[in-house]
């Protein structure tokens, strides 16, 4: 094949007009669309930044609320334990008071029973003494009336004492 002669620098006219159209398009884009698109992009960027800040604030508030909740829960547990301890102490005190009262009542009952027994003993002694006196008088009358000898009187006295 024969070498073709080509110009050293050749510019295609279609390419030239495409470049001109591109530059005109860039000019109109920059003049009419760049600011609104930049505003929309900046607004979106600012909105995302604000949402991230708000998310961080919300996370911190949630952490703080969690700490407060844990503190309140701990305080409630402590208070519940204190209430239980006070209730147990009160129950123990009440138990002690009831036992003390029961012991006191028992002691009173025992003393009352002892006094009653002592009173009954005294009463029995008085009755026995009066009965022995009556028997002795009766025996003495019989001894005088029958004029018994001393052996018979001693035997009667022994029989009388055995009763």
UniProtKB/Swiss-Prot annotation:
CDD domains according to UniProt: ATP-synt_Fo_b
Cross-referenced InterPro entries: ATP_synth_B-like_membr_sf, ATP_synth_b/b'su_bac/chlpt, ATP_synth_F0_bsu_bac, ATP_synthase_B_chain
Transmembrane annotation, as ranges: 9-29
Membrane-topology annotation of the record: Single-pass membrane protein
GO molecular function terms attached to this record: proton-transporting ATP synthase activity, rotational mechanism; proton-transporting ATPase activity, rotational mechanism
GO cellular component, one term: proton-transporting ATP synthase complex
UniProt-listed NCBIfam families: ATP_synt_b
Family: Belongs to the ATPase B chain family.
Extra remark: The ATPase of I.tartaricus is of special interest because it uses sodium ions instead of protons as the physiological coupling ion.
UniProt protein name: ATP synthase subunit b, sodium ion specific
Taxonomic source organism: Ilyobacter tartaricus
Species classification: Bacteria, Fusobacteriati, Fusobacteriota, Fusobacteriia, Fusobacteriales
């Amino acid at each position: 094949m024969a070498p073709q002669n080509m110009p050293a620098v050749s510019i295609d006219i279609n390419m030239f007009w495409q470049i001109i159209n591109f530059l005109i398009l860039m000019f109109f884009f920059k003049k009419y669309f760049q600011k609104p698109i930049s505003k929309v992009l900046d607004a979106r960027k600012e909105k995302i930044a604000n949402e991230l800040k708000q998310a961080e604030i919300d996370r911190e508030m949630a952490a703080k609320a969690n700490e407060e909740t844990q503190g309140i829960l701990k305080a409630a547990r402590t208070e519940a334990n204190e209430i239980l301890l006070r209730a147990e102490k009160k129950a123990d005190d009440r138990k002690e008071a009831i036992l003390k009262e029961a012991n006191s009542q028992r002691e009173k009952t025992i003393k009352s029973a002892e006094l009653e027994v002592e009173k009954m003993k005294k009463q029995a002694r008085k009755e026995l003494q009066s009965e022995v006196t009556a028997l002795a008088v009766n025996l003495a009358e019989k001894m005088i009336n029958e004029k018994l000898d001393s052996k018979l009187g001693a035997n009667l006295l022994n029989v009388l004492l055995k009763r």
